[in-house]
Amino acid sequence: MITKNPMQLKAFIKNKAAEKHISAQLVMQNYMLERLLERISLSPYKNNFILKGGFLISALVGLDTRATMDLDTTIKGFTLTHEAIRKIFTEICAIQIADDVQLEVVGISDIRETDDYPGIRVALKANYPPISVPLTVDVTTGDMITPREVEYTFSLLFDDRTISILAYNLETVLAEKLETVLSRNIANTRPRDYYDVHILYALRGAECDKATLRRALERTTQKRGSGLILTDYPEIMKEIRESDTLRRLWEKYSREYEYAKDISFDDTCNTIQTIMDAIKV
């Protein structure tokens, strides 16, 4: 989107935030991540990056239904090293688009929070002076995508056009979320995992192929060494439902996010149970 000046961009952002009932900061963050994504789609590396995580879920269900602050991708076709990632992102940031935004790489670090897949975190800055927005991109490798990534048509926030990127298929997104919820059991302190399963299935469940989802979940649990959840899920769900801590966390989450306020913790648990019963191995 071409804007006359930063004030005009801020006005667009403010209007979109009011329309979607989310904060202007979230809309600005998503707009700048979108600017990065368009550069990836125009780069020689467009077939090496596969979009996943919260940004993809937001694209699937709508920004007013699921907001996120960072970008998650997996890569294929080259070895994941600090040097390679710095070179690739420096090249991507150098791509010029008529959007007045300049991107720069600020830092590269290892992802420490999860052992699911090896990963690197890229810190970037999106500049449209005096606007400066810090961005985070997590890059992993070795992800289990079943059966394969898909070409996803991504609608832009302010322009009446789309960009094409590779992304996880719906079944793999759901499989990873289900595995996370069930394997972490009552130790999971992230209500959004429950929300994501619920909203994806509510809005996109009709498009989900049950046999593919079953296979995706089997392969994800094999990769993560959590195969027991496939048979133990009724007991796990009973523990989850009885957890006062998880209920309190959910109540806090639903107060914080407008889009979750009419969904109960039991609703999310019922959705997970329904999916698992439907794909019973």
Question: Can you say where each PLM-predicted feature lies in the sequence?
Answer:
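Structured mid-to-C-terminal alpha-helical surface segments
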Residues: M1-F49, A59-A67, L71-V281
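Catalytic metal-binding/acid-base residues of hydrolase active sites
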Residues: L56
